[in-house]
């Protein structure tokens, strides 16, 4: 395979005036991962940018690996992310059905027509026989299929069947170079003879991905195939199959292909499905916003501009160009993902933030399943104090728990050990004395009283002076702004918590 710079010649049958039809076609196996979501996002944005359509198709022909649970997880993931589709499961469309398990008759018919036209041929060689032929010829036995069955006679086929062998169906690859203009990588050439004739149909009649994927793309009139770099090696086989499908009248064009860069994990290794950060729902459960996660995943191969990392999905749709996607591997950086999400959290309107944070406070045990109006009012009042400090929504559980703990309140043991030792006693006593005398319980009054009594009165630097007060009142060394938090808690609760460590 060679990849010279892109030339003016685009080896594709796509016409500029043909309406864009992109597709997202995962297999329902395991849990949706960020690489899969990045592919879905790029296809969705590409379709929307070009006023085209996105087809959602389920490639579920492997009964040993596919599951209904994984299928539902895919639907759940796309709904949570807000990536809708124009055709596919639960939506329908003129080219359905959109689950491959419901299209077996279609594949059987196409395979029959390709076989009758001589585009496919029956192959009986076993892997052991192929390796033996390579060894006998002094070649590497791992070279793969050697195209030896291309011209079997009817008598030879009958003899194999008499032995009880079932034929697989292979595509007859062309004897010339296959060149195409990759939308991401430029012009790519696979030399003649570098790709063995692939199996399209198993001996038991089951169609393989090598047949079903291009056939569905052809029948569904897909114009652009944007997918992971790991599928680049399958492209010459698919282009050859498209040529065959054109010759038998199934389609009249070949889509354009674009292969997206790998997503790497720590240590420059490809991000594994076993890595926690690969799991989409891990990020959702932590409290990522859909728009925050999509923004970060967009950056794994593309950028809106050199000096800007934070943007909305609408802004991405407006600016997206597939030709600006990088071909270089992208590394998943959790810290940067967190920073992007935090920026989106800060941008939320107050009511929007409240609606999103309450479920995390409920699941974290801070609020009951049915919060009271008084509890919601407290969250609403505290929201401006915590929203600026959150990385993910679940951080609100630790930051806001102190507002609702009531008689069960107790400082975090590690924080108490650090800030509520014997040397904290003078600070707490001074704070209680000053605050008891306050005529008004306001943020400004609390701040002035504490600074006068502790900082000025005891001669202690503010950072050290207020650590015992913060831990006694909020239970943590890191909390929302102290004076505002005490105003929210009220005089009685604040003073009770300040007195508790004094015994």
From Swiss-Prot:
A motif ('KMSKS' region) lies at residues 270-274. The keyword ATP-binding applies. Its EC number is 6.1.1.17. It catalyses: tRNA(Glu) + L-glutamate + ATP = L-glutamyl-tRNA(Glu) + AMP + diphosphate. It is found in: Cytoplasm. Gene3D superfamilies: 1.10.10.350, Glutamate-tRNA synthetase, class I, anticodon-binding domain 1 (1.10.8.70), Glutamyl-trna Synthetase, Domain 2 (1.10.1160.10), Glutamyl-tRNA Synthetase, Domain 3 (3.90.800.10), HUPs (3.40.50.620). Residues 126-148 are annotated as: Disordered. Keywords: Aminoacyl-tRNA synthetase, ATP-binding, Cytoplasm, Ligase, Nucleotide-binding, Protein biosynthesis. InterPro entries: aa-tRNA-synth_I_cd-bd, aa-tRNA-synth_I_codon-bd_sub2, aa_tRNA-synth_I_cd-bd_sf, Glu-tRNA-ligase_bac/mito, Glu-tRNA-synth_I_codon-bd_sub1, Glu/Gln-tRNA-synth, Glu/Gln-tRNA-synth_Ib_cat-dom, Glu_tRNA_lig_a-bdl. A motif ('HIGH' region) lies at residues 26-36. ATP binds at residue 273. Residues 130-148 have a biased composition (Basic and acidic residues). One of its GO terms (biological process) is glutamyl-tRNA aminoacylation. The keyword Electron transport does not apply. Coiled coil: none annotated. Belongs to the class-I aminoacyl-tRNA synthetase family. Glutamate--tRNA ligase type 1 subfamily. Catalyzes the attachment of glutamate to tRNA(Glu) in a two-step reaction: glutamate is first activated by ATP to form Glu-AMP and then transferred to the acceptor end of tRNA(Glu). This is Glutamate--tRNA ligase. The lineage of its organism: Bacteria, Bacillati, Actinomycetota, Actinomycetes, Pseudonocardiales.
